[in-house]
C-alpha cells in the first residue's frame, strides 16, 4: 500500500537523491507526498522543530517550550526517518516566530534546508497544559497536520509522543512506535532481573525483585503482561507477570527446563521449551501453563521459538543436524524445514511482524552477528559485523527497527538499528551493568506501570 500527500517536493528531493519521499498525483487539485517507509534507499528528512511558543497562563515557563520541542525532536530522530536541524542555525528567536501558516516565513526555513517544520504553542493553567501543534510542508508552504491537546502537566511527554505517532500516521500511513516499551534483562543489582523501559530507553522500571536469576522476557500481544524464566526455586521455571500488579505467577514448574516462552500472536497461549520427558521439546501451553500440544518430537534439542505473525508457522533452533540451525515448523502439516545452511551455530530467530523476514544470531569468524533471511531461505544478509558479539535480535512492532544486544564497547548493552542494518546506535539506558535479551512490546494504549 502506498501513502501520500503534496506534490512539489519532487524537484528538491530528486536533487537530494532522497528516494524516501515519492511523489504521487491522483488529482491536480489534491496532490500529495508520502514517505515510503519500505524504501531500501532512505535519506533522512530535514525537519525544524523550534522551541514551543509560550501563550501565557499561570506564570512564565519558557524552559518547558524547549523540553517539549526536544522530546519531539528526539522521538522523531529515533525513528531514523528524520534529521532535526540544529536550533543554533535558526534565523529568529522562537518566541518571535509565527506559529500559523500566515505568520511563518517559509523562505527562511527553506534557506536553512528544512523540508518540514513543526510549530507548537502551549498554555499552563495550574496543573493543566494546553498544546496546539502544527506540522508544515516548507517546500509547498502548506499546513499538513494540526492537533490540539488539553492534558495534565504530568502527561506532557506522553502527549508529545501522541503527536509524534499521529505525525507518522499522516506521513506514512502507519502509527509510530512512540507508545511502545522494551523488556530486557539487567544486572545492575548484581542479580539478573527483568526491567522495562520506554522505546528510547527512558523511564526504566525494575519489574522482578526475587534476588534470583530472571531471564528471557517476552511480551503478550495485548501488552498487559510478560512471561519470563525465573530461578526462584533453583530450577528454570516459567512465570507470567500482570504489569498492573507487578506480581510474577508460575505457570510451568515441571522437572527440568521450562524456558524460551513466546506468546501466540493472538494471545491466550504460548510456545515454550520443556524437558520433563528428558529431552527439550517445543510445546504449546495455555495461559495457565497446561499443555495443549507437543509441537516437536525427536531426539534433538529444540529451543527459541518465534511465531510468524499469522500464527501458522514457528521458527526455532534445533541441533538435529548436529549443530544449532534455524528451522521453520508448519503447524498445519506438523513438518519442519531447515532454514539456515550457512554457519555452524545459528540461534535466536525473530520473525518480522510483517511476516517477510526472519532475524537470527549466527557465529561468524569467531563472533556472533545478526543476520536476516526470507522465510523461504532466500536473500541471506548480514546486518552487523566487525564489532564484538551481536545477539538476541528483536523487531519493533512496525518492522522498521531492530533491537539487539552487543558487547562491542565491553559489557553487553542494547543497541538499535534500521531494518537494513544501517544507523546502528546504542540505546540510552541510564542503568549500570549489562543489558541483554531484549523484547519489544506491541503498541500500547495505556500508560506504563
Can you say where each PLM-predicted feature lies in the sequence?
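Amphipathic beta-strand/beta-sheet edge segments enriched in Tyr/Trp
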Residues: 33, 99-166
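Residue-level detector of Asp-centered blade-edge/turn motifs that repeat once per structural unit
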Residues: 177-178, 221-222, 265-266, 309-310, ...
